[in-house]
């Protein structure tokens, strides 16, 4: 106990060997556990060594670190939530995003959530830039479920929290999306089979400031549904689950802050970008073997889903290819609720592409980089407000 060894060194045990690399130390703590520490934890940000080219081992370590943070977020959300929907059905997702709202890593949660949450984060950034939302501060959390700005359907509420690392602007974002049991509307459960407008389906939120300086803004929250004809039927449970999402996001902040403190913000951002670039390369290898094709499907109500898929040169990178998915020919948005928001359409495409990959990579924004979606505004895969969307979201998620 108390013994300390500086790397490089090799520690032989009865059942294996431990490699202590240069820059690391190994010590035995009071519990007789071997603790490995990197010297970078003793540096200030200015003193940290210059970044080295990222190798596959370092990239894999960071990939698992990012995913572990998202998993910790999910576990805290499960443990602190109140509703059966989140606590037992596990209808929630947690993820990390870069400063631009690009998905970096996630826990293996709900695909339609994970592929669309980035749209919600980017919508928040756009509204901040347009002064439609106050400048973000440490301790903020905002809520959004708007299907026309990154949401899926109204019961899925996303809590978005910026992560600051000493600068004026967020360095990262963490977000959690949960399916809430009821958000008001004409039917209990907020999934009416006969809705014809988004107003029928419940509470609509777009970047509502829910937490400021770590305190719940109850006045903002209560004002958001005060004028609704049919308000949420169990507001106490809804509020409790939203507070659980805030707690989950706090777990994500803590994980990222510890990682930045240990490794430095520059290296963390470099590894996030590297993870996305690697995913993009994997998708490019996939599409290089695909052929042009088209498909059309008639639904029970006579509506048409049409798609043409083509591999074309990338205009921004002439030596690379991109996969174009053209949904022109798809029927106009329906009078009922079989309309899938563009964020759902995007999430479905992203998940299908991820399933086709042989590479073991997390779903992230890089998977979408070599893709181009052409979805006409006003069709049933990209409806305009105030279209009803609850059935389109469900059918798209199950497709």
Feature-to-residue mapping (PLM):
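C-terminal, non-catalytic interaction/recognition modules in large multi-subunit enzymes and RNPs
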Residues: 1-399
